Regions:
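Flexible coil/loop and intrinsically disordered segments
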Residues: 1-538
Length: 538
């Protein structure tokens, strides 16, 4: 209370304004008056506009966003009360005493010292209208929205678009960014149509509503809605095509800082070019990135930029999927009309991915004694009798020293001795090979999710292989070790590495990843990625 029957409204201004407009329409006079602290002195006050609402027109409503909504609400009320009987029923509700069926206003008076605390408590946890909510309401508004013949169809199409964008397969092809509070996936579509930049959207999630859809100076609502539908259908066509899906998804993953700008550019190209020209342009963009620092696949190594390596391995997986699809599609006996597999970009964005050494790196990276103990136990299981042979007296001696001291430097010496012996006995890829084909070469690297990679630390190849196969879904539930592992998505090429699918000779050994295995693996990369590095035709 401010005295003299004046009150400061903490919460409920919209409800009071709605009641005011109802009363003005039903009785033609003010039930109370408003004073606004933030009225612009350069335009008529909101209180004056409310007072004269019955005589205001659409032209004056366009001067101010508040005037527009007040005007719209008043005319919605007038349309609602076209039936005089309905108008009288509402008057009866207002005029009856409170002990009869009537409308009463309830309010709470708060001490001035507690007004800010009360406001916070009242609004805590409220769900505010999003940009999408506002645009949907604008389009479907009975008074000022789309023409009546379009509204019903628009409501159904709007719902279908929202549902399709909730499909993670579709969404992560075009955008891998995490949405902030108040942002929606439909906003992305509206931003594309409105020409909203990513930087503008990050600052104001309602930018496209304020600056385009609610701007009466721009095209009419029907034209704007048509642009939304056409843009969505073009995106959906890109998703439905196995080639554009994979190439756009790969480029989005590689450069996800500015998805609005990227998709805007690709949409423009898609409108201008034929389908085959568009696919060629996408592949050309990928080629430029892959060959920016490396002119050949064998120039890549563990020391290359990790972002570049991730794209290289991603494209190996993508081209493996696409070329397999082409082989099956060309076989008339199979009658394959649609794609049979799509790379799940949502998992690329949601999970963390490592560049993994197939044959473990010689350097020890164990952070605590528990990890070191677990690794030693796994080594004894994997090597079996080889570990306890008399010739391994040096290893036994180092193990005794470490078991007594538990010092990291003593473990590192033991670890190095074990790894060197393993490499020597199994033809595993060596460290510091004179021809440069060491453990840092591209043929000893693959893409693996961080969780699986770090779960087995620097395990030997046989154990890594078992981890990968079990994580990929082939497990024995009665086996304690295998049942403890969490199923994960294993990219096709990573799976083929650890199952040694690239080595088709009859000399195959499952005890280690050899240089021969690495050479066959790189050969497949060169074949699958030939267009990007050898200027082969598409």
């Amino acid at each position: 209370p401010l005295g003299d029957e004046r009150y400061s409204v903490i919460d409920g201004q919209q409800r009071l304004t709605t009641l005011y407009l109802l009363h003005m329409y039903l009785y033609g006079n003010e039930p109370y008056t408003f004073e606004y602290d933030r009225d612009d002195s350069n335009i008529p006050s909101r209180s004056e506009y409310l007072k004269n609402i019955a005589s205001e027109n659409e032209k004056t409503a366009d001067k101010n966003i508040d005037f527009f909504y007040i005007y719209t609400a008043y005319h919605y009320i007038s349309d609602f009360f076209l039936d005089d009987k309905l108008k009288q029923s509402f008057r009866d509700l207002l005029e009856r005493p409170k002990d009869q069926k009537s409308l009463q206003v309830i309010w709470y008076e708060v001490e001035r010292a507690r007004q800010y605390e009360t406001f916070r408590n009242l609004n805590s946890g409220k769900i505010h209208l999003t940009n999408t909510d506002l645009i949907k309401a604008l389009l479907l508004n009975r008074v000022s929205g789309l023409p009546q013949v379009e509204r019903m169809e628009a409501a159904a199409i709007f719902e279908r678009m929202e549902r399709d964008l909730q499909n993670d397969h579709f969404w992560y092809m075009i955008n891998g960014n995490e949405l902030r509070e108040g942002q929606t996936r439909m906003d992305f579509l509206f931003n594309l149509v409105a020409g909203c930049k990513q930087s503008d959207y990050d600052i104001d999630s309602r930018w496209s509503f304020r600056n385009y859809f609610n701007d009466s100076k721009k095209e009419n609502l029907s034209q704007k809605w048509k642009a939304v539908r056409h843009t969505f259908l073009r995106l959906k066509d890109m998703y439905d095509n196995i080639y554009s899906y994979h190439y756009i998804g790969g480029l989005t993953y590689n450069s996800n800082r500015n998805p609005i700008n990227n998709i805007t550019r690709w949409l423009a190209l898609n409108r201008e070019l034929t389908h085959s020209e568009f696919i060629n342009r996408l592949r050309s963009e990928i080629k430029t990135i892959l060959t920016r620092k490396h002119k050949a696949i064998t120039e890549y190594s563990y020391y290359s930029d990790k972002k570049d390596l991730r794209l290289l391995f991603l494209m190996h997986n993508i081209e493996t999927i696409l070329q397999r699809f082409e082989q099956l599609h060309e076989d008339e006996r199979l009658s394959l009309e649609n794609e049979y597999e799509k790379f799940p970009f949502e998992l690329l964005h949601r999970q963390s991915w490592d560049i993994e050494h197939i044959s473990s790196n010689t350097d020890s990276d164990f952070r605590n004694s528990a990890d070191r103990k677990a690794w030693l136990e796994s080594i004894k299981q994997d090597l079996g009798n080889e570990y306890t042979k008399d010739e391994n007296s040096k290893i036994k001696e180092l193990e005794m020293i470490y078991s007594t001291s538990e010092k990291r430097e003593d473990f590192n010496r033991l670890y190095t001795a074990i790894m060197r012996q393993y490499d020597d006995k199994t033809d595993s890829i060596k460290d510091n090979a004179p021809d440069g084909k060491d453990k840092m070469q591209i043929g000893n690297l693959t893409l693996l999710d961080s969780s699986t990679n770090r779960s087995y630390h620097n395990a030997l190849f046989p154990r890594k292989r078992r981890y990968i196969i079990v994580a990929d879904g082939i497990s024995d539930k009665s086996d304690k070790f295998e049942s403890s592992l969490t199923p994960r998505y294993i990219p096709p090429c990573t799976r083929q590495v650890f199952t040694k699918a690239y080595n088709k000779t009859n000399k195959l050994s499952l005890n280690a990843w050899t240089q021969e295995d690495a050479d066959f693996y790189v050969k497949d990369m060169e074949q699958k990625l030939g267009y990007y590095f050898n200027n082969e035709k598409i």
